[in-house]
């Protein structure tokens, strides 16, 4: 697998983490009644969003692949 395909899969995984973060925030805000569980789920969601943002930043600013 070449570098361009690896960057594509990292970007796709980052989008998956963003989707997981959105679903977790929805779950924590509208479906959970337990306060501790709300905090735990929303913390998980914000960590997913932070990690996905870092991955996207690295993929985008690493530049195009020379082939």
UniProtKB/Swiss-Prot annotation:
Signal peptide from the UniProt entry: none
Keyword Transferase found: no
GO annotations of cellular component type: plasma membrane
InterPro entries on file: DUF2768
Its membrane topology: Multi-pass membrane protein
Compartment list: Cell membrane
Principal location: membrane
Matches recorded under Pfam families: DUF2768 (PF10966)
Record keywords, A-Z: Cell membrane, Membrane, Transmembrane, Transmembrane helix
Spans traversing the lipid bilayer: 8-28, 41-61
UniProt key word Nucleotide-binding: no
Protein name as catalogued: Uncharacterized protein YphE
Lineage, opening ranks: Bacteria, Bacillati, Bacillota, Bacilli, Bacillales
